[in-house]
Amino acid sequence: MNVGKVVQVIGTVVDCEFEGQLPEVLNALKIEEPGDPAKGIPELHLTLEVAMHLGENRVRTIAMGSTDGLVRGMKVVDTGAPITVPVGKPVLGRIINVIGEPVDEMGPIQAQDKYPIHISAPEFTEQSPTTQQFETGVKVFDLLVPFVRGGKMGMFGGAGVGKTVIIMEMIHNIAMKHGGVSVFAGVGERTREGNDLYLEMKHSGVLPQVALVYGQMNEPPGVRARIALTALTVAEYFRDQGQDVLIFIDNIFRYTLAGSEVSALLGRMPSAVGYQPTLSTEMGALQERITTTAKGSITSMQAIYVPADDLTDPAVAAVFAHLDGTVVLSRQIAELGIYPAVDPLDSTSRILDPRVVGDEHYQVARGVQSVLQRYKELQDIIAILGIEELSEDDKLTVARARKLQRFLSQPFHVAETFTGTPGKYVKLEDTIKGFKAILDGKYDDLPEQAFYMVGPIEEVEEKAKKMGYTRQV
């Protein structure tokens, strides 16, 4: 057993000295102190991860927990391996932290297998690039931003535009409609939201199909910089068992931010905007592990907080390079009360291509975007001169655009308790049929309010009837 001692503690950085063999970089070290209840000194169980070798038999480590109570001279044991976490079915329905310990007060996790969190991405020859659409049941995604099975989708948005609610709805739809396993990584987000998500999943019955991995805002940077890797390790196990897994990362920006904090603590020279010099390397190491192999697939959805709504921020730009599609959430659309507040003109997907989604889907999607684009161009004229000054064709375009805009909204299952409107899952063929009918002018006579917060197009007619509107045949 390789034993050393603590020689220096600066915040969450701990330097340790070993007389014999030095622990390797990324090895986990353990500090176990019994404490003294009589003196009010609590027990101490802390895991450290070796970050660098300093020379003179010293290593610099990052703490995976609070360093309160650490003193020089404490005994440190080298585990001889990286942090390992439990994987497999026993993890489903549970909340674990960065080192794989349960934090849901439901007893220990009886897992047979434990995997290290630092492993290489699958070899190029093991990967299986697929271009198949993944149905989400959310109209705006399925039509305009089709998800790739085994791909990576990024969700960009400032604070309070609905990123977390969309992720919760996606987990609900995957569990209820696809029977798939999901892994949720809470990276540096609010503990209250993590708790709400857990209770919501318990309430809606999807919890047995989800593994929750939390390293929230109150945790030290070492935890937030590693929690995504822990979640990915859990997901990789299910993929290698032949399953299609969904991993949700909320929020990938906090992963970068934690890396920046750790980098500063380790004394590295910062690069652009104060980020770590290894920004793209760290992002690449994480993203390359999210992939499809011959055995199974990992599809990921990553919420990306955009600081000050600036899409050119280096952290945001580093994520962009890895994505198959981008869902841009817009504050202007949220202000109109249209949720999910997805910007239909800014959001993109690699597979919105007739060779993948088919001609009809492609034509309808592009048709919707062109009508909305024309409406956007006409808004200045409407604001200055009024809608009456437009030509008859443009008036019709504006009326259809407003209906399309409202039809892109949808009631969510996970928001039922707040809105009182039952959630809707809309099949892809129903989505295409509905938007095609609006573009073809079949619903030009119905009021735009009837298109707001409904599921398939049939519900528009029902809603119009309830509003006392009779169709002109």
From Swiss-Prot:
Pfam families: ATP-synt_ab, ATP-synt_ab_N, ATP-synt_VA_C
Protein keywords: ATP synthesis, ATP-binding, Cell inner membrane, Cell membrane, CF(1), Hydrogen ion transport, Ion transport, Membrane, Nucleotide-binding, Translocase, Transport
Key word Nucleotide-binding present: yes
HAMAP family membership: ATP_synth_beta_bact (MF_01347)
Major place of residence: membrane
Protein name stated in the entry: ATP synthase subunit beta
Record's function text: Produces ATP from ADP in the presence of a proton gradient across the membrane. The catalytic sites are hosted primarily by the beta subunits.
Membrane topology: Peripheral membrane protein
NCBIfam families recorded: atpD
Superkingdom of origin organism: Bacteria
